[in-house]
Amino acid sequence: MSTNQGSLWGGRFAGGPSDALAALSKSTHFDWALAPYDVTASRAHAVVLFRAGLLTEEQRDGLLAGLDSLASDVADGSFGPLVSDEDVHAALERGLIDRVGPDLGGRLRAGRSRNDQVATLFRMWLRDAVRRVATGVLEVVAALGDQAAAHPTAIMPGKTHLQSAQPILLAHHLLAHAHPLLRDVERIVDFDKRAAVSPYGSGALAGSSLGLDPDAIAADLGFTTAADNSVDATASRDFAAEAAFVFAMIAVDLSRLAEDIIIWSSTEFGYVTLHDSWSTGSSIMPQKKNPDIAELARGKSGRLIGNLTGLLATLKSQPLAYNRDLQEDKEPVFDSVVQLELLLPAMAGLVGSLTFDVERMAALAPAGYTLATDVAEWLVRQGVPFRSAHEAAGAAVRTAEERSVGLEELTDDELAAISPELTPQVRDVLTIEGSVSARDSRGGTAPKRVAEQLQIVREITARLGHELMR
């Protein structure tokens, strides 16, 4: 049987919890990550208690000195949780009491509950964590942008359904991976507007009767405002679910990029060569160079999706207000951050180190009759209705297939036999260079448009980097 010594809730109970309950309740193995934020919030709480007339100046200064000492010891690892500590809050109260005594240390608990306390700390931790994740995402975007800049005119087969569709610029394709990642960072910036609301002062659920100033402590802790509803503030974890979604979306976007790299590096495609420093070998096959980073990115996306769905399942049936189920809210979010902080630098390094075989990609770009759409659109520009143009281009493909040649190898007579509108001038679009250059609409694959897109990506990256520093 455990004891209630050091517990934050033992007065009403004649004895301690069972060993099984104590083991089940224990959370220091994961919530110790909140310790620096807990100490910071306790400093702000001491100041608010003083302003409310609940501490003398001497008591306030004594608590602040004790908290400074505790913060230093937490930071250097000389203070940590004991087996008997139920959670991070109990461990830190024990540490504070060791430094300032039980009378003074016990005064800090006035006006706050673990319910509003942990909701606040979780938001503080997440606001820092999402910035670290966003910085890592922007590094992947920068690597994509650098590769795009290094290959401004390289042409590759653009695909739909994994079938060759139309020629596009390699830079165009790479930047298509950058934009979703930038939207992920924009989601993080937007998320912070909702996360920057402080639950502190909400108590267990009903608020405080001690004359505390939630707005003051919100400002002291870097929040933009205090919560409008104390029940909502202590019971809601939609901010955690929103963050978990953004993390999962980042993982999904990385997984799609990773899938391309895995396919491109295969012998059959041969678009890219992996750098030795960013790939691994086989324990039995000496020739192998494996895209482990990309494969781990693909695998971890499932893990982060699972973290999101698990959290949502935890939240779905809880009555207001706080329930102990919410002890399960942090581990999936913490894990998602840990995984992304491992993955993002590796993905940035992998992307930046890829060597592209631009000659092979260009040679494959017209394969599969990818210039057929150019033939149809050329006919449209000559005044042919698109239905007729589509049929003529399809007939040209059929003729080329029967002869086992490319569209560009059809003779003038063969083209004219298919449609009198297919004059020799159509050959202007029967090159991959002509095809990509013709697609100069906004967002298109023409070199000048892709150069604009690269500039836009870099401008958005710079703007988001600035917003994350606020």
UniProtKB/Swiss-Prot annotation:
GO terms assigned for molecular function: argininosuccinate lyase activity
Gene that specifies this protein: argH
Gene3D superfamilies: Fumarase/aspartase (C-terminal domain) (1.10.40.30), Fumarase/aspartase (Central domain) (1.20.200.10), Fumarase/aspartase (N-terminal domain) (1.10.275.10)
NCBIfam families associated with the record: argH (TIGR00838)
Protein's name according to its UniProt entry: Argininosuccinate lyase
Domain of life: Bacteria
Catalytic activity of the protein: 2-(N(omega)-L-arginino)succinate = fumarate + L-arginine
GO CC annotations on file: cytosol
Family that this chain belongs to: Belongs to the lyase 1 family. Argininosuccinate lyase subfamily.
Sorted UniProt keywords: Amino-acid biosynthesis, Arginine biosynthesis, Cytoplasm, Lyase
Compartments, record wording: Cytoplasm
Pathway connected to this protein: Amino-acid biosynthesis; L-arginine biosynthesis; L-arginine from L-ornithine and carbamoyl phosphate: step 3/3
Enzyme Commission no: 4.3.2.1
Organism encoding this protein: Mycobacterium ulcerans (strain Agy99)
Family matches, as CDD domains: Argininosuccinate_lyase
Disulfide bridges in this chain: none
GO terms, biological process: arginine biosynthetic process via ornithine; L-arginine biosynthetic process
InterPro entries with a match to the protein in the record: Arg_succ_lyase_C, Argininosuccinate_lyase, Fumarase/histidase_N, Fumarate_lyase_CS, Fumarate_lyase_fam, Fumarate_lyase_N, L-Aspartase-like
